[in-house]
Amino acid sequence: MNIRKLNKFFTNLFLKFNIVTSKTVDINKLKLLINLLKPIKTNHKLIRIGGKNDGGYLIPDDLENIDCLFSPGVSDVASFEQDLIKRIKGLRCFLADFSVQNSPIKHKSINFEKKFLGSISNEKFFTLKDWITKKTKSKNDLILQMDIEGFEYEVLINTEEKLLNRFRIIVIEFHNLEKLTEEFAFKFISAAFEKILKTHMVVHIHPNNTVKHLCRKYKGLELPSVMEFTFLRKDRIKTFTKIERFPHILDRPCTKKRADFILPDFWYH
């Protein structure tokens, strides 16, 4: 069993039996974090890139002069990458995933590496810094789209603020968010969010409805287990207002097998 499958196995085990591995977090600390993550409406409208269901994400329509997309955890779905190639002339797409043999699509703009993204570089993993340094010398802006099954936290914590600032738009699927109720997990997860919030702001959130155990209720709050977050770098935001209603008109369920999971009110009100 590889590292990713082992991580997923224990995550599902914790969810199934609702195991609490540390003391519970102070509710005020949790509310403060969620307040920082509430999405805003900016001067850039949101557009849907990718498939109608899984693999499609809402991002700001601010795509001029972006040179590269870095997309770790591609698996067997690459509709997001395909769509961006059509929309951005000359875009180069760098894909990575150790769990598959090849890129799910073939295109002259696609470059695939059989590696996982992580906090170290070895025969199976590389860091975001090492990957970008190897693949591009461009000084223009980049896009990051990351779905790496829980490894997103260590990657963000390990990545320098200067490097994160290279990405104009960042899309990340965050996992195990129901563990925000646990003190130890809260410190780890909140550290990753606080890192990215130094340079970016949240412009969209969409819960993933494919997870069997959709959320944990904690002192009046609902914590969806897996959610897709879209971030826009702060210097691209000229004006912004609060978002008063979800879902967005362009949101679609990740799987058609069940109804979409609507973002709970406290995450945006």
Mark where each language-model region is:
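Rossmann-like AdoMet/SAM-dependent catalytic core
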Residues: 3-63, 67-70, 77, 113-114, ...
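Short, conserved active-site loop motifs that form the nucleotide-linked donor/cofactor pocket
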Residues: 109-110, 142
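Conserved beta-strand signature within the Rossmann-like core of class I S-adenosyl-L-methionine
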Residues: 166-177
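Switch II (G3) loop of P-loop NTPases
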Residues: 144-151
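Short, polar loop motifs at secondary-structure junctions
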Residues: 95-103
